[in-house]
Structures are given as C-alpha cells and as structure tokens.
C-alpha cells in the first residue's frame, strides 16, 4: 500500500456576518501566508491567521486563511458565505464567496500520491457507501412528521423534545362518536385549534383531517342526494378557520382519509369522488389560496382508487396542491412511491401539483429503530415528506409522538434515531444503498462533524460495512478521523441516551475508511459520527 501525503485545506465559517478578530496570525516556516479578510494579518511563528487581525470588522464573506506550507507556498483559505459585510471585506485569495445565511465551504483533502489504494472493505452481509465529495443539498428533515401524538390542546410535550427532532408537520382532527351536530364539532375544533397553535409556534404546517371531524357520527355525504349536513359542517369548519386566522399556507385541508378502506368510507367510489368535489369547491370558494391535499388512500401511491382519483380531479378541475397516500400496511418504500406517483401525475399533465406527502408511514412491525432509520434515509432520497403512523389507543393516542416517547414524554430508542436525524446539519452526502440497509448522511465543516444515520428495513444481521470515501481534510488531520458508533436498541422503554458501541480514531487511507457494524439485532438502529481526532 502506498502512503498518502496529506495537504489540509481550511474552510471559512460564517454565522450571520459577525466574526471574532484573530489573536495574531503568523507565517508558516519558509512559506508565504495568506491574509485574513478585511484587516491586516499579524505575524507570529507558525500557525495560521484567521479572520481579521487587529483590523476593521470582519466581512460577512471572510473567514480562515490557508495554512502556510513548511518550506513552500501557502494554500489560500476559503471564506464563508455569510450575512453582513464589514468594511473592506474581500474574501481571502482563492476563497469562495457568496451571500446569505450560515454556510461553510467544505474543502476536500488533496492526496499527495494519486496512485494510493483505498482500504478493502472486509466481507459483510450488506453495506452502504458514502461519497463525501458529492454534496446533495441542505437538510429538510422530510421524515419527521406526526399524526396526532401530542396533547389534545397542543401544549405538551415540552418544546425542546420537538425542536430537537426538527418536526416537519402535524396532522390532526378529532374523531368524536356521538350525535352529529354542533357539540361534536366543537370538541373536534378544540383539537384543531390547539394543534395549529403548536404547529405555528414551531413554524410547520398542520394538516386538518376533515373527515375525522365528521365521519363517525354524521350521515355519509350525498346519501340519497342530500348534501345538507355535510355542507353545514364544512361551513362551520371554514368559518372557524377564518376566524382563527388559519387561511395561510401553514394549513392544509385533507378532505377525506382512506376512502378505500371500508372502516372509513361505506359508500361507493363515485360517491366519495363527489364528496371530494363538493368539499374542494366549498373550501376554494371561501379561501381561494387554501392548500388542499389528498386522497390519503390506504393502498399506496398507485392502484385503481388512485388512478380514478387523478382522472376525476383532472376532468373536474379539482386537482389537489399536494397528493398524499399511506404506506401503513408494511413493505412500503418512499423512493418507489415517489417514482410511481410522479409518473402518474406527469402522464396526466397535472401541472398544478406542488408536491407529495406520504402522510402515514410505518406499520406496527416497522416502528423500531432499524426500520425507522431506513425510512428516514428513503424520505431524504425521495425528497418527499412523511408522517409517522400512530397505532396507539385511548389517551396514548395524544401522548406518544408516534411511538417515539413513553406516556410521560420520556424519549425511547426510536426517539434517538430521530434526534440524531435532527442533529444533522450542513450538506447531504451521496449514499449508495445496500440491499436491506440504507443511510442518510450529512457533513458540516462549521460544526466540525459528519453524522450518518444507518437503517435496516428488516432481516439483515451480521456485519454491515459503512464505506466512507473522499473524506475532507478538516475531518482527517494527520491521516485519521474519530469515529463514534452508537446503537439504538429495539424497545419501547425510556432511554436516556444511545448505547456507545465504540469511540476511537480510525485510520484514513486514500481519503477513505470503513466502519463495520456488528448488527446483531435487525430492529436496532445505528448512528456513525465522524469528528476530527
């Protein structure tokens, strides 16, 4: 094996435009130092200069200068791309400049010998491969949506429990069994109002389950040609929504849930489609900019009901803004679903569709750390949103966050999968999936770490390789990187923290390394975190 000569590249970080002044930069031995941005660099004996050195305010595009080589020329630093620019703020020579927000420009290591040989992965049952040189955008946390799962009034759980996992959306109504009329509708409205308040606080949308407010007590819409009761109910709901200031894009109208399931729809397919049309037109007339989604079918993204729905919507000009479906029966895959529904929409020329929403995912058998992590990887790969199914009964329906916590809001092992998913920042890394195993991975030079959430859709036990290629220089100074491997064991009991399997430096060869997981229980989930040693 040929040794690798490492050259470390430095990245510039910026956060809102303000940067601390460096405390005296210095020249490298025998080299020419790069300068900071917006000030005069200091001098010293070895090291690097960062930002301003005793000068005017550091510019928003400024950052860290390059490291001077020993006996050679220095490598220019890369500047961050931040908000405000101070006086005199040009980026460092050779740096990357831009505008807006907090970013780090990830710099790749430069191999000293291009003839080196990457490590050969050991024999394994399955593997995933990461290419850290291939960036695929910022985090969106697509899979962190929930159906009910918080208190009926929306005040619980504590906010920190939700923000840590980057909640993406809520979905709620309130099924009330009893007399059809104002009393039942008022109970249902209190839940919607409470959930909306929490969603607004977190800056995420609420999907209103219209049928959950109506179907359990009232006559089927259009029975005998009579739409009076349903129209009255819709009028009341629309009036409440308008009075509560809920007419913006942070509210989505889901007009009926799982009409292809006999437990939620007793009529014909044609009657359901007419119900969709009546509700759609009533909402559109009252709130022209309303966001409407559907059909939320139990049979997935394809099939006869979905095809009939899309054809009907096109013919009657009642196309939803978001198309939704469920994979709650087991065996679903967001990537395959996205391909199926995209083709169906494109074939029909439904240009008004804004996006897709798999708003119930995961059977009871799939709600474990391993399969949940696999789902998260698939949602990010597909680029569509997902909301966890809620299989709880009674009061737990409003206190389990989709089986992520105990009834007194204590995190369990699945919660920690979503917590590490929420911890991911920076730029998504290209991942080649295995047969049963997939991963979602991000790197963030500003945060100084890369987090890899690894999932198993079921069945695979034994050795699983996580092959990591093109590791950037900031993660491997001196030819090694620190690898933390955490295990989230299957189970519903409270878990204060994941189990640490290992935490040690790993050798990097040809900018690559291999982390091997001994996956003893397929339903466990794993997280790999890389940091500089």
What are these regions (language model features)?
Residues 1-6:
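Sec-dependent N-terminal signal peptides
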Residues 9-12:
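C-terminal motif of bacterial Sec signal peptides marking the signal peptidase cleavage site
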Residues 16, 21-29, 33-37, 41-45, ...:
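Non-catalytic accessory regions flanking glycosidase/transglycosidase catalytic cores in CAZymes
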Residues 20-22, 66-68, 76:
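Intrinsically disordered, low-complexity segments enriched in small/polar and acidic residues
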Residues 153-154, 216-345, 364-378, 404:
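Active-site cleft segment of glycoside hydrolase catalytic domains centered on the general acid/base Glu
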Residues 166, 318-319, 383-386:
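Glycine-enriched alpha-helix->loop->beta-strand junction motifs that scaffold or abut catalytic
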Residues 328-425, 470-474:
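Catalytic-core region of carbohydrate-active enzymes that cleave or remodel glycosidic bonds
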